[in-house]
Amino acid sequence: MTKNIQVLFVCLGNICRSPMAEAVFRNEVEKAGLEARFDTIDSCGTGAWHVGNRPDPRTLEVLKKNGIHTKHLARKLSTSDFKNFDYIFAMDSSNLRNINRVKPQGSRAKVMLFGEYASPGVSKIVDDPYYGGSDGFGDCYIQLVDFSQNFLKSIA
């Protein structure tokens, strides 16, 4: 029998992109009827600025508009994540560098850009929408749905 999969999404502060990725991915898993394939779907940040906080209101707004809800509270990446997760997906190149900088030697986690699962013509980098307007959050949502669907196809 195939081992269940643990997936972690990582951005900078864990209030915009990664909690959206977690919620979108969970939704896509449910829509595909693949819940039994996953033990853990979570998100965190490389920084600790927002630990314990709910996602940015604009993240919650985009999720709600698309019928997705989350109860996520921000947390920081920890060394235990590298042994507890099969995939650690970074939202951008800076996140990826920061994750790899603290990755313990011998880690079992596959660390990569979530955007490696982008469809042709879709940017692999999920830009941080924090300092922009609501449009950036909508753009993130579109990318994250695309990446999620393609990742799920890749493991089917």
From Swiss-Prot:
InterPro entries: LMW_PTPase (IPR050438), Ptyr_pPase (IPR023485), Ptyr_pPase_sf (IPR036196), Tyr_Pase_low_mol_wt_mml (IPR002115), Tyr_phospatase_low_mol_wt (IPR017867)
Keywords: Cytoplasm, Hydrolase, Protein phosphatase
Catalytic function, reaction form: O-phospho-L-tyrosyl-[protein] + H2O = L-tyrosyl-[protein] + phosphate; a phosphate monoester + H2O = an alcohol + phosphate
Main location: cytoplasm
GO cellular component: cytosol; nucleus
CDD domains listed in its UniProt record: LMWPTP
Molecular function in Gene Ontology: acid phosphatase activity; non-membrane spanning protein tyrosine phosphatase activity; protein tyrosine phosphatase activity
Pfam families assigned: LMWPc
Protein EC: 3.1.3.48, 3.1.3.2
Disulfide bonds: none
Source domain of life: Eukaryota
Active site annotation, chain numbering: 11 (nucleophile), 17, 128 (proton donor)
Similarity comment: Belongs to the low molecular weight phosphotyrosine protein phosphatase family.
Protein known as: Low molecular weight phosphotyrosine protein phosphatase
